[in-house]
Amino acid sequence: MSQENVEVLGVAPILPSRNLTATAAFYVRLGFKEQGLWPDEYLIVMRGEVGLHFFHSALLDPWSSDAGCYLYVDDADALFAEWRPLGLPSEGIPRLHGSPNDTDYGLREFALVDPDGNLLRIGSFIAEPG
C-alpha cells in the first residue's frame, strides 16, 4: 500500500496531569468516558470519536501550564449549555471561560481550563468551511 492510500483516522493531544484519577473524574463529569487509566502513568478519555490522553506530571504547576488543544464540535452553544450547570467558576483553575462568541476566523467558540491548567478551546464552524 502506498503512503497516499493511508488514511489518518484521528489525532489526540497528550496533556499533563498531576493526578490522573482526579483528571478522569473531572472529564467524566464533562461527559467523557474513561477508556483507560493507569495511575501515575497514563489516562485516556473519550467523547464520541475524540480522545484526550494524559500523562502523569507530578511537578506540574497549573498556573504556568501552556498545554492545550482545540476541540471541534457540531454545536458549541449546546456543549456550553451542557457544561454550564456543572458549576465551574468563570475565574481561577479550573474554569469555564467566557461564553460562546463568534470569531473573525469563522468559528463560534468558548474555552475551558481544567484543574491542571490545560486550555481547551471548543468551537463549531459558523458556516461550512471551504
Language-model segment annotations:
Residues Q35-A67, L119-S124:
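Conserved short beta-strand elements that form part of the metal-binding/catalytic scaffold
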Residues M1-A22, C69, S124-G130:
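N-terminal beta-strand motif that seeds the catalytic metal site of vicinal oxygen chelate
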Residues E7, L15-L52:
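Core segments of cupin and vicinal oxygen chelate
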Residues V6-L9, D61-D66, D104:
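Short glycine-enriched loop/turn motifs at secondary-structure junctions
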Residues G10-A12, E49-G51, G68, R95:
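Structural motif
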Residues S57-A58, H97, N101-D102, S124-P129:
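Acetyl-CoA-dependent GNAT
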Residues G10, P16, H53, A111, ...:
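Conserved beta-strand segments that form the floor/walls of ligand-binding pockets within enzyme
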Residues N19, C69-L119:
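Vicinal oxygen chelate
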